[in-house]
Amino acid sequence: MVDFAFELRKAQDTGKIVMGARKSIQYAKMGGAKLIIVARNARPDIKEDIEYYARLSGIPVYEFEGTSVELGTLLGRPHTVSALAVVDPGESRILALGGKE
């Protein structure tokens, strides 16, 4: 079992993540992400776009069970984060959430 909060912080510290729905959609379109994480309460149109483009690019999508406020807090940000793209997992095992590792 992967501890989401721990692995997310590890990916943030040792790898590369890109925060924000717009950037996550761009990475889904380009196929540049290894995993996309979407908050449970993200707007439906954002979820649909991310899922559509990620499916075309073969990128797994993980739905975070918390809200965008909680996701932002986990990342140490003072704002909401509705989606993020994991470009490089670094030393984390975050990709296990998407079934890849």
Swiss-Prot record:
Superkingdom of the source species: Archaea
Task: Supply one GO BP term.
Answer: translation
Q: What name does UniProt use for this protein?
A: Large ribosomal subunit protein eL30
Q: Which GO terms describe its cellular component?
A: cytosolic large ribosomal subunit
Originating species = Thermococcus celer
Keyword Ribonucleoprotein present in the record's keywords: the answer is yes
The record's InterPro entries line, in alphabetical order, gives: Ribosomal_eL30, Ribosomal_eL30-like, Ribosomal_eL30-like_sf, Ribosomal_eL30_CS, Ribosomal_eL8/eL30/eS12/Gad45
An example Gene Ontology molecular-function term = RNA binding
What's this protein's family per the entry?
A: Belongs to the eukaryotic ribosomal protein eL30 family.
| Underlying gene | rpl30e
Any matching Pfam family: Ribosomal_L7Ae
Q: Which UniProt keywords apply?
A: Ribonucleoprotein, Ribosomal protein
